[in-house]
Structures are given as C-alpha cells and as structure tokens.
Amino acid sequence: MALPYHIFLFTVLLPSFTLTAPPPCRCMTSSSPYQEFLWRTQRPGNIDAPLYRSFSKGSPTFTAHTYMPRTCYNSATLCMHANTQYWTGKMINPSCPGGLGVTVCWTYFTHTGMSDGGGVQDQAREKHVKEVISQLTQVHSTSSPYKGLDLSKLHETLRTHTRLVSLFNTTLTGLHEVSAQNPTNCWMCLPLDFRPYVSIPVPEQWNNFSTEINTTSVLVGPLVSNLEITHTSNLTCVKFSNTTDTTNSQCIRWVTPPTRIFCLPSGIFFVCGTSAYRCLNGSSESMCFLSFLVPPMTIYTEQDLYNYVVSKPRNKRVPILPFVMGAGVLGALGTGIGSITTSTQFYYKLSRELNGDMERVADSLVTLQDQLNSLAAVVLQNRRALDLLTAERGGTCLFLGEECCYYVNQSGIVTEKVKEIRDRIQRRAEELRNIGPWGLLSQWMPWILPFLGPLAAIILLLLFGPCIFNLLVNFVSSRIEAIKLQMEPKMESKTKNYRRSLDWPASPRSDVNDIKGIPPEEISTAQPLLRPNSAGSS
C-alpha cells in the first residue's frame, strides 16, 4: 500500500534522533538580538522614525539560520536546543552570517527547494530520505500470516488530517471577513502537486499587530522561496541603511527598522524578491515589503466548478482570490429567470448522468461478485485437492501448523444490495421521465412568484405611464383655458369703460365733473382746454 503524500512529507521533514543526544547549542546572546517591528500610519512617500519594542531583555536568546552555504564552514557538528537538532560551526568567510570566526547555528534541514551546495543540510536530507525509503521497503516486503481484513489503518489514512481541516477553516473565516458577499456554497480546492505559496501584501490601513512574542528562538533566513506575488502596488516597504531608492512608485508607505536583527509578529513576513523571511538582520540587497502568506488554494462557486470540470478550454486561475468569489452568485441573481432555467436544465442533466453512473456501478458490483464467486470455487477446489494430498498428515491446516480458514459466501447480501440499487435507479429514471426539464421549474415557482408582482407593476407603468401623463397634461391645459375664457369678458368691459371716458367728447348739457372714469386732477387740467372752444362757438 502506497503511503499518502502528506504523511510521507511530514515523515521526511522530521529529523531523526540518535540514542546519544548532541551537546546543547552555544549560539546564545546575553541580551535580546531582535526587536519586534511596529509603526504608525504614515503619509505616502514619508520615512518616519522607527517604532519598535525589545523582548526578553537580559535573557539569553537562541539564534539560528535556515540556510548556510557550504563555503562558509570547514566542519559542522550537531547540537541540541529545545529538543530540536541544529548544526553549529565557525564561519571561515567574512561575508557569511555572523562574520569571520564566529560560531553560528543553522537548521538541520534547509527549506524545500533550497540547496546548500552539498553541505551538511543536503547530506542530512539525503540520509533521512534513504532511511525512510528503507523502512517503507522493509514494511512492504515483510510477509505475515493472513489474519483477516483490517480496515482500521485505511480509515485513518482516509480520515481528513487535522492540520488540513484547520487550514480550510481559517481560510473560510478569512473569506467571510473580507468578502462583500457572504459565500455559503463554494468549493475550496488544494492542488495535489507542489505549488508555491501566494503572497498578499499587507494593506495600508492594517494595524492589528501583536505586541508580544512568546519564543526565545529566532530563525534568520528564508522560510519559503518561489512565492507567487498577487499585487505589486500600494506596498508597505522597508527602508534599510543601504536602501537608496526611496521613491519607488510601488511603495505607498515606508518603514524604517533598527540596524540589528529584528522580527515580525506571527502571521506576517518580509518578502524580498521571491523569498519570505520572519527575521532580517537589518540589510537586504533587494526591495522588501510586508506580506501575508496563504496556501495555493482556489475558490470555486458551483457554476465555476461545473465549467471547470466539463470539457471546455480551461483558463489559468489565480489561487485564493477569495475576495472576488461572489461573481457567479451575483451573475445568477442578475440574469433572473434565464439563469434559473439554465440551472434547472443543468441539474436535470446532472441527475440523468448520475442515474447512468449508478447503473454502471451496479453492473460493476455484479461483475465483481461473479469474479469472487468464481475465485471462491477455484479456491475450494484447490483446498479439497490439498486436503487429499495431505490426508496422511492430518490435512492442510495441521500440515502447515496454522489455524484453518474457511470461506463464508455472502454473495446473497451483495445481490440483495444490488437489487435495491437497481430498484432505486429505475424509480429515479421514471421520475425524471415524468418530470422532464421543464417540470423541475415548478419547484422554483415559490422563489419566482414574489418577483412577478413588482415586475408586472414596472411593465404596466412603462406601458401606460406616458398615456396617463398626457391625459393629466391635457386636463390641466383645458382647465387653464377655461379659466382664461371666464376672465376675458370682465377685462373687456373694464377696458371699454375706460376708453369711452377719454375718447368721446362731452355733451353740451353735461357738466365737466360728470365725466366718468377721469380723476379730479385730470378734470381740473381739462377745463382750460374747453373754454376757448366755448368762446369761439358763442
């Protein structure tokens, strides 16, 4: 039986311990060699004073490197710290970590994908892999008497690993926190082959950093390499003493760490190039920024997974973009009845295919049972022949000195189960023939009916709204015209009276003061004009 991939991986990465424990490691310092990195929100492009906090003041701190080139030491010995094996040796090159003549410790294995050039880390990995392969070969080659079928180990293998469940739960929790939609039906997929981790830069507004570190051990060096970086803008960059380009357009915020070794809180990493670091020694040749690391997980909606499984041209997907996974759900809601009809047809087709698959499974079970019956007949025939040949010595079991094994034929149970499966398949096929793809649409009617009322109101408003508006406009216009017609006789009567008083001459009998419509001031001014006419007439 082949060992599962994840179990084999964990077995290879664990160092082997000998009976004689190595001496304790001496890579200790009296004062804290590292500080935790803190900062405030800064304006883009500005470099403010560093904010950091020291830990383990006055207490020794163990420091080890995750990678040590073969050219940095002549010899290396094993040492022990916190029940973990490390390598230790003196540096022979001034450019190596620590400097010339300094005793430095590094990890037993380097990380995956990195080689120290044939040094002790590569040799230890090769040795341990050979030991594991030898143990597996010995286990598989060792023969033991048959004692019945034991499926307990198979169940343990098939059981989901605890760390894998924790990884899925953490990813799902983060997905719910950052996604605008609250996804409930989705598929979270991990690749079977090895793929690099994904780097997500720390956002500018992130300030949720822990201020406590519970360990006194520091690992300096890359932890993961060959990262896949999702975004290259709005980065929180780190300014070292040898950094010259502080006007990089990709960096929206700059932070300045101390010059000695410093570490980030748990869950945050320095990404320099394509490698991730937990601690740095205050200098780096490439630009570094703060980032989160997430596994190469892909999020699918049900429709996306269907499109991915069916035989269509497959486009490359970006892993763990959980923050845009609601596109399929929103598209289904936006298309309305059309999308519901498409989904109904898809489920109808899937039900028919599943029915056919169950039929083939039933046929396979019948075929396997026939093979078992044939094999059992052959075994019983051989058993009778062996009993006849070894009858003088008491039979086959006594001749071998083992317990006698007997075959219990349970083909009737298998036949009965297959008959039940066939009955279910036939009943399901009849239901699908009676319902049809459009019959499944009736199951969606309780969801469609609440939308029909508002939809009908909108359609009626669009159809009859312009007519009603025109009627209202015509009614208001007619009322205004009627009011104008009622007011015109009064206005004309007043105008006629006023014109008659000024234009017509006064009669000889009438008095000047009897003129209507003329104010007293106008009458007084009109009297001198009338006297010459009266004198001329006389």
Swiss-Prot record:
The cytoplasmic region is essential for the fusiogenic function. The 17 amino acids long immunosuppressive region is present in many retroviral envelope proteins. Synthetic peptides derived from this relatively conserved sequence inhibit immune function in vitro and in vivo. The lineage of its organism: Eukaryota, Metazoa, Chordata, Craniata, Vertebrata. This endogenous retroviral envelope protein has retained its original fusogenic properties and participates in trophoblast fusion and the formation of a syncytium during placenta morphogenesis. May recognize and induce fusion through binding of SLC1A4 and SLC1A5. Endogenous envelope proteins may have kept, lost or modified their original function during evolution. Retroviral envelope proteins mediate receptor recognition and membrane fusion during early infection. The surface protein (SU) mediates receptor recognition, while the transmembrane protein (TM) acts as a class I viral fusion protein. The protein may have at least 3 conformational states: pre-fusion native state, pre-hairpin intermediate state, and post-fusion hairpin state. One of its GO terms (biological process) is syncytium formation by plasma membrane fusion. The gene is ERVW-1. Residues 465-484 are annotated as: Essential for the fusiogenic function. This is Syncytin-1. The mature envelope protein (Env) consists of a trimer of SU-TM heterodimers attached probably by a labile interchain disulfide bond. Interacts with the C-type lectin CD209/DC-SIGN. The chain crosses the membrane at residues 444-464. One of its GO terms (cellular component) is plasma membrane. SUPFAM superfamilies: Virus ectodomain. Glycans are attached at residues 169, 208, 214, 234, 242, 281, 409.
